């Protein structure tokens, strides 16, 4: 790497990070820890680095102490592992002291883990971002030797979305009719919570989402993994969007994709699902009462942001509702989140936290009400003491049935109070 380019970018970025305006995220950093921030493209990882840089400057650090470097800058080409040392040397020639490293999208450089580990061993303070879920894996944690804290980064929560829209909740908001709140929720429900969408005009939001999806699809999936059957990958993602509410086996997905894209083996589907998850586009839940060997092969799949799911569906309301609940629970509870399927199905359960959730657009239909409450009753018998919830679009009540107490709560209220 030409050190002149590195020095130009270092100085340019030091000016930039001081002046960026952002919505402060509800993520705190320990002052003596190193971090790896992992999440979907455009989920706000870079802005978290800016937030942390501004916090450190407010605490007395000089802007010149911060070495922020974006490895996806279009002025950089064909970066190698050795270029990381060149960037470090360029900074030291400029200032003559140790920087605070903020390395954005470093995963595009093969072997970056070794450099990151060496920096930590040499007592540098380091913050790293990446758009590949492999950076969350135990393998990476082992390579980094426990020297970094790994922080998943998600799109805006509904509360953060309201803050970004400058909508504040009045006292006793739970009991008031608030048109601004409801309007903001419906937009968040359909368009999602990617931070940059807040400043995009409404008429262009769907186009912006489509462009980002194409970048993930072509850049992070087709090109990165050398996919030889792009139609199969495209079809698989669409089939996942159409089946958000149902468990899907590898064999069923292989059959569905094969009807469109030619014969696709089950092993290929397993690989493709792993790639899709690695981009942080999709996550999954397992059946808590299935045998261990069956859990992986019959999962439910959800999209990490409702905006992407909206791109695929013509009548998306019920799917978007369950997907949004899944996002919230996944962000809060991670791998503790399951579904329950044993003759009856409960959409989400948190065994360790003694909670179970059904998701229904409306609970007014008598047959639907009987079926879904019956499933919660069956779950309660198997896991006594669980708190039971029904998340709806806009209905609220408390149901007391025999020994059961079930809270029915609108999703917009649940997102702000749970």
Positions of PLM-derived features:
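Accessory nucleic acid-recognition modules appended to NTPase machines
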Residues: 65, 199-356
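Pre-Walker A adenine-sensing motif
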Residues: 13-32
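Domain-level recognition of nuclease-like catalytic cores that cleave nucleotide substrates
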Residues: 395-418
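Interdomain motor-coupling "hinge/lid" segment immediately C-terminal to the ATP-binding subdomain
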Residues: 2-13, 133, 139-246
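Hydrophobic anchor at the beta1->P-loop junction of P-loop NTPases
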Residues: 37
């Amino acid at each position: 790497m030409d050190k002149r380019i590195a020095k130009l970018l270092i100085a340019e970025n030091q000016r930039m990070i001081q002046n960026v305006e952002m919505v402060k995220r509800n993520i705190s950093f320990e002052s003596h820890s190193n971090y790896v921030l992992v999440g979907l493209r455009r989920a706000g990882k870079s802005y978290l680095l800016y937030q942390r840089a501004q916090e450190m400057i407010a605490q007395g650090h000089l802007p010149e102490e911060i070495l922020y470097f974006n490895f996806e800058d279009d002025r950089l080409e064909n970066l190698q592992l050795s270029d990381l040392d060149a960037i470090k040397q360029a900074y030291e020639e400029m200032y003559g002291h140790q920087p605070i490293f903020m390395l954005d999208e470093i995963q595009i450089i093969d072997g970056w883990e070794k450099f990151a580990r060496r920096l930590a061993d040499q007592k540098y303070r380091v913050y790293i971002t990446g758009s590949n879920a492999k950076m969350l894996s135990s393998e990476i944690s082992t390579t980094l030797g426990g020297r970094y804290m790994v922080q998943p980064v998600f799109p805006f929560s509904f509360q953060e979305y309201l803050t970004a829209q400058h909508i504040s909740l009045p006292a006793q908001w739970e009991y008031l009719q608030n048109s601004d709140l409801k309007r903001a929720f419906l937009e968040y429900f359909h368009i999602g919570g990617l931070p940059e969408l807040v400043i995009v005009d409404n008429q262009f939001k769907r186009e912006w989402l489509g462009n980002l999806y194409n970048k993930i699809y072509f850049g992070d999936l087709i090109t990165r993994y050398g996919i030889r059957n792009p139609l199969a990958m495209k079809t698989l993602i669409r089939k996942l969007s159409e089946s958000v509410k149902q468990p899907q086996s590898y064999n069923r997905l292989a059959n569905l994709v094969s009807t469109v894209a030619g014969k696709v083996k089950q092993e290929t589907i397993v690989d493709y699902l792993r790639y899709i998850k690695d981009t942080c586009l999709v996550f999954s839940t397992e059946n808590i009462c299935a045998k261990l060997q069956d859990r992986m092969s019959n999962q439910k799949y959800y999209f990490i942001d409702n905006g992407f799911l909206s791109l695929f569906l013509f009548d998306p309301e019920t799917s978007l509702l369950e997907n949004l609940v899944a996002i919230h629970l996944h962000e809060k509870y991670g791998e503790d989140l399951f579904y329950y399927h044993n003759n009856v199905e409960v959409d989400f359960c948190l065994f360790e936290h003694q909670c179970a959730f059904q998701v229904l657009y409306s609970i007014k239909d008598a047959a639907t009400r009987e079926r879904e409450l019956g499933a919660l009753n069956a779950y309660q018998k198997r896991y006594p003491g669980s708190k039971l919830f029904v998340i709806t679009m806009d209905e609220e009540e408390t149901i007391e049935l025999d020994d059961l107490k079930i809270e029915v709560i609108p999703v917009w209220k649940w997102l702000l109070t749970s």
